[in-house]
Amino acid sequence: LFTLSVRNGSKRRMVVSLGSSSNFILKTKPWAHQLKALEYLYPRDAAALYTKPGSGKTKIMIDLIVNRGFKRVLVVAPKKPCEVWKPQIQLHSDIPPENVHELYALSGKKKAELLKTFKPVQPGEGCSIFICNYDSVWQKPVDKVWFYKKLGIDCVICDESHRIKSPSSKCSCFLARLGKIVPHRYLLTGTPLAENPMDVYAQYRFLDRSIYGTNYRAFCEQYQNVDINLSARVGFPILDKKQPYKNLDDLKEKMFSCAFYMKSTVKLPKTTRMVIKVPMPPEVEDVYKELAKEGALEMEEGFLTVNNALSMVIRKQQVTSGYLPLERDDGTTELKRISTYRRTFLYKFLKQLPESEPVVIFAKFQKDLYSIRKVAERLGCGYSEVSGRENTLKNWKSGKTRILGVQYTAGSESID
């Protein structure tokens, strides 16, 4: 392996030669596993990239776009990961910022209007990249525009592709149709089998339908182990409890026939894991035990009832957070605060840390994030948040704030 730095006008690039493989033009130096992944993906028109979060999948795909010479690229991702792509493209390539279109930030009408302005690719034309989220890529009026010949989409990248694992979802079906006409297709995810082996079907229906076919029932018959007797009694398929799946070696062999998987070569600092138990005060513990025992609570401000096991889990979590959603007789709901013990503990814990130490705190409920914000204000340090209501991550990354509160659902994927 050797690298040679060359100049292209005022810009500096690297030409990387991998033995007998093609020379890759790279703007930024790749890690070893990124080079191997690029070498694997480069000759393939349909392939999957399975590496862990933080391993640089986005850079690999940007380098692939540049070196394959794609002209019209559609990147589909969840909305939060969509925000990562444009800064990464500017960092790892010389593609002009004006050629990167963040469609996820536009209405459906404006998406369609923008795409309709594109004419067929001309000789010498640069690359245009369209970044769109899964929730809107298939919706009208933009859905038909992706198929226009004059738009000429020649590559589709599904980032966090486990989002299309449901064979019946409208987004998954739409991308399967689009995959039939687009010559180059790629999957990116760290969890291709997020819940069970059946998750692979819809992803590969988009990627390469020749691998598992397009008949989901036949796919299930081949890889699911159904309890025939129990299924006959209830009238619908029930999987065998002891061995719900079969032929998994065959499934994995086909799955990795066009997929690259490799552990990251990046050596991160060792982490220290500590479990700190925060005892509940007696008044909170009493409420928790009564709720667990009776499945209901009655207070002066209102009452609370639990109808199922999932609801019970959520209500218990709310109690430990120090809040209770109580319903009044008139049907209105009040979120009653029963304790601030966790806020007090968090303040004492953060007080022990160096003032320059950046902190990330994950939480589930909006009231938890509110408590974290109040602790930050009490400490006199800045606060940023990644949630369904707010995204001020840039302030934390730039050092303007010290504490970052992250809601689990909003910060679960591709936060750079």
Show which residues each predicted segment covers.
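Charged, low-complexity
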Residues: 1-47, 91, 98-99, 127-129, ...
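Conserved helix/coil segment N-terminal to the catalytic DExD/H
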Residues: 110-125, 129, 135-152
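Walker B catalytic acidic pair
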Residues: 159-160
